[in-house]
From Swiss-Prot:
<dbReference type="InterPro" id="IPR011827">
    <property type="entry name" value="LeuD_type2/HacB/DmdB"/>
</dbReference>
<keyword id="KW-0028">Amino-acid biosynthesis</keyword>
<dbReference type="GO" id="GO:0003861">
    <property type="term" value="F:3-isopropylmalate dehydratase activity"/>
</dbReference>
<dbReference type="InterPro" id="IPR033940">
    <property type="entry name" value="IPMI_Swivel"/>
</dbReference>
<keyword id="KW-0100">Branched-chain amino acid biosynthesis</keyword>
<keyword id="KW-0456">Lyase</keyword>
<protein>
    <recommendedName>
        <fullName>3-isopropylmalate dehydratase small subunit 2</fullName>
        <ecNumber>4.2.1.33</ecNumber>
    </recommendedName>
</protein>
<comment type="similarity">
    <text>Belongs to the LeuD family. LeuD type 2 subfamily.</text>
</comment>
<comment type="subunit">
    <text>Heterodimer of LeuC and LeuD.</text>
</comment>
<comment type="function">
    <text>Catalyzes the isomerization between 2-isopropylmalate and 3-isopropylmalate, via the formation of 2-isopropylmaleate.</text>
</comment>
<dbReference type="InterPro" id="IPR000573">
    <property type="entry name" value="AconitaseA/IPMdHydase_ssu_swvl"/>
</dbReference>
<dbReference type="InterPro" id="IPR011824">
    <property type="entry name" value="LeuD/DmdB_bac"/>
</dbReference>
<dbReference type="InterPro" id="IPR015928">
    <property type="entry name" value="Aconitase/3IPM_dehydase_swvl"/>
</dbReference>
<dbReference type="InterPro" id="IPR050075">
    <property type="entry name" value="LeuD"/>
</dbReference>
<dbReference type="Pfam" id="PF00694">
    <property type="entry name" value="Aconitase_C"/>
</dbReference>
<dbReference type="GO" id="GO:0009098">
    <property type="term" value="P:L-leucine biosynthetic process"/>
</dbReference>
<keyword id="KW-0432">Leucine biosynthesis</keyword>
Amino acid sequence: MVVKIKGKVFVFGDNVNTDEIIPARYLNTSDPQELAKYCMEDARPGFGRRDDIKGSIIVAGENFGCGSSREHAPVAIKAAGISCVIAKSFARIFFRNAINIGLPIVELKEADEFEEGDIAEVDLENGVVRNLTKGKEYRIRPYPEFLMKIMEAGGWLEYCLKEVGE
């Protein structure tokens, strides 16, 4: 079960939209590994092709994932190896799409206290986010048991298939 997530922080600002996360010019494929190459391409060119993003955590400001409803956006983030997204707030459709594909996301009003390169730890079950670099701890609402099961299964579809198979 994905309970604790730890990784290097990459900071993005407010209103990061789905076109910045995965630009429309790359939507001619649904292959997650192809999408991963262009993750965050219009927000930070070349980000998806960096070697040091595997297992990292994106920390952003308000309204992350706004814009068009595009499941490709959280798929690109997850396929690039990003383990979690922390933001002050999320566009509701992005939030749901991320949960559906098994990408952990966390709303944290103090997200702007993180800096590029900090090491963060997220405990979904107990509702704690830590900035290990600065020695700070923040309380968040823990994931409910149902969402933890979706995360454990790897996404909504995988969860449903598991439930049907049992």
